[in-house]
Amino acid sequence: MSDDAYGATIAKYRLARRLAELRRGTQHTANHVCDMLNWGRGKVGRFEANQWKRPEMSDIRDLLRIYDVGAAERDELEDLAVRARARPWWRDYADIFENEFPGFENDAVRIRVFMPLLLPGLLQTTDYFEAVMRHGSRPPAWRRRSLEARLRRQEILDRSDGSTPVLTAVITEASLMYRWGTKVDRREQVDHLVELSRRPNVELRIQRFADGPPVGMHSMVNIFDLPQGEQSLVYLETDYAIEEVSSTDSVNSYIQSFARASDSSLEPADTTAYLIQLAEQLE
């Protein structure tokens, strides 16, 4: 396991679902299991809802005993629990992240992101981020912590252990036209986008003014495709919160909307050419 705790969030997510399936297979209610183990009411429900930080191995073994799980499956689930117990870096940023967003982003095999007015966080330079934050109402200490977390998030694009996700980002021409910082700052941001667009795991697409209003999406959307066939998750961003969307119908709707937004945007090669031309204008 890499030092960014790759796989810990997915392991915890999968373990929660498997425990729920096992309990339902025994016909026990969650409260009945709590009573059998002398646990407080609600503990099993929290486990199954993935509302835990790190599963305790003794708790997992107690549940597997109650559910009469065979040796092979028990070993598999205990291995999941061990991986789920890894402490990821974002646990130190609970003041910045209120949910599992950074964990699923960290573990995703594919990330699709659409931002109508700003550049996605994974693509931002430090100067761009600081310029955006200066216009907000967050205190300086929070902004510094948020920048630290943003830089840690971006490290997933540089992993060399085979776990680097594929990133598809649809950005708008508007996000590139705002005046912020100095011309040098803006040039560095565009140069950074050019460099990213040339990576084999990054696909950038621009929605231009000339092509009409954005098609398909109008809010900040992140779609995380998870490993081993897990259902994709969607996170919606606002200035003050990141909301998870997990229902199958809603997730599928956002995936379809993203496809329309992507199809109405410049192809990746044309996007790179556009960005190079924009960088030249900022010389």
What is each model feature region?
Residues 2-7, 11-17, 21, 25, ...:
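Interdomain hinge/linker segments and adjacent boundary elements that couple functional modules
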Residues 42, 83, 216:
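Short Asp/Glu-rich motifs
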Residues 182-283:
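C-terminal regulatory/effector modules of DNA-binding transcriptional regulators
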